Amino acid sequence: MSGHSKWASIKHKKGALDAKRGRIFTRLIKELTVAARAGGGDPDMNPRLRTIIGDAKAANMPAENIKRAIRRGTGEEPGVSYEEAQYEAYGPGGAAVIIDVLTDNKNRAAGEIRHLLEKHGGNLAAPNAVAWMFNKKGYIVVDKAKAGGKDEETLMNAVLEAGADDFQDDGENWEVYSAPESFAAVNEAVKALGIEPTSAKVSLIPQNTVKLEGKVAQQMMKLMEALDDHDDVQNISSNFDISEKEIEASLA
């Protein structure tokens, strides 16, 4: 499995730990604030905000926290002003990495991201050095064990009718792909079946993958973990391909 879906699975497995540290709430608050600032505070008119509100509710974030974050984004309440930034990089084994951040200090964030990359066998790349290796797609992961008894045909028909352009069976999960502009409708179609996706967002999907094994694979996992633990990092995309055995070893 390639890096985008593999890392989504890893993050899901470590979700309970993240929640204890408040990391999920911190990230969601930033995303809510920025989404409201960019597209307004009405979720009916702001698909990006509507999706993040759904994520926040799924994470059991209190309703007042959600409202407060949105009000900060619209300027109704004072708060920290976050800026979006994206860094392109190479990881161990030459794997491409794209790091999305929300930060109140771009210079500080860039320096810290550079340090983490160099510490774990990677390096920052020039703009557009690796971005061309990815396509922007709506990407939804459904855990078969949590599909509420719905079979593959039922889910596939629902998402294709809603605008999905690809549906894949990945063993434990089903993966649904769509154009970014169709993502909201496809995600709603999944939820209308009573299914809560493991992961659902507009993502950068690699066109090709780089297979990593052994020490290099473990080093890549350590880099991903270090980046994910950074307070400003919101999302990481990569084109690595690592076996389930290597993944389990990294989680042990």
Predicted regions and their residues:
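Positively charged, low-complexity, intrinsically disordered RNA-binding extensions
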Residues: 143-252
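N-terminal cationic and glycine-rich segments that engage phosphates or anionic surfaces
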Residues: 1-141, 182, 211, 252
